[in-house]
Regions:
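Short, solvent-exposed loop/turn elements at beta->coil junctions and helix N-caps
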Residues: 78-80, 106, 155
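Acyl-donor binding region in acyl/amide transferases
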Residues: 111-162
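Conserved donor-binding loop and adjoining core beta-sheet/short helix segment
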Residues: 84-126
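A residue-level signal for beta-strand positions that form part of recognition/binding surfaces
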Residues: 41, 115, 167
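Active-site rim helix/loop that mediates acceptor-substrate recognition in acyltransferases
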Residues: 69-88
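Active-site/acyl-donor-binding loops of N-acyltransferases
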Residues: 2-21, 25-28, 150-179
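Short amphipathic alpha-helix that is part of the acyltransferase structural core
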Residues: 14-74
Length: 179
């Protein structure tokens, strides 16, 4: 079954239109209100699996930025098969053809709710593309998700002001005891 069939039809009022080679098979989410806020021409693109390969090297640079702050659960190369088979989704922020940011999401079907989890998000010029997050929220709603979740550093709460810290993830490294 195709990835889009699993995700359902888009019912959001957000305009969508395919453009260019990369975007030809991806859904493109553009907000005309936010588009001109910083004088930029940002496009937030949900990249189809078949369009990932041409931009993968740029995406890896962004993933590596986020992974540097993780507990080592995944390396950039570990995302690739999940993105290619549709288990995770790749979003990119493009401004006049430049790839400024990448985000990986995953649909989590909990027993009592469906959630869109942000696995990784990083890039440059965040103050210009972060304002497009409501477009991704709209997509999440259109596929039946009732909330978003993000495992990130505390600093994200300053940026995502309408989010709350629901709980903390506490870890302990046991590798020293393995030898």
């Amino acid at each position: 079954m195709s990835r889009r069939a699993n995700q359902g039809e888009e019912t959001s009022s957000t305009p969508t239109e395919p453009t260019g080679i990369l975007e030809a098979r991806a859904r493109e989410f553009i907000s005309s209100k936010n588009q001109h806020l910083h004088g930029s021409n940002y496009k937030i693109i949900l990249v189809a699996p078949e369009d990932i390969e041409p931009i993968w090297d740029q995406v890896v640079l962004h993933l590596d930025m986020a992974i540097a702050h993780s507990e080592g659960e995944m390396g950039a190369e570990d995302f690739y098969p999940y993105l290619m088979d549709g288990q995770m989704q790749l979003w990119v922020a493009r401004n006049d053809g430049e790839l400024d940011a990448s985000m990986v999401t995953q649909i989590i079907p909990y027993p009592r709710k469906r959630v869109l989890r942000i696995i990784s998000i990083a890039g440059d010029k965040m103050e210009q593309w972060i304002e497009f997050l409501p477009l991704i929220e709209g997509w999440a709603l259109s596929i039946g998700c009732t909330s978003l979740e993000c495992w990130g550093r505390k600093g994200w709460l300053k940026i995502l002001q309408d989010w709350k810290c629901s709980y903390h993830i506490i870890t302990k490294d046991l590798t020293a005891r393995m030898h």
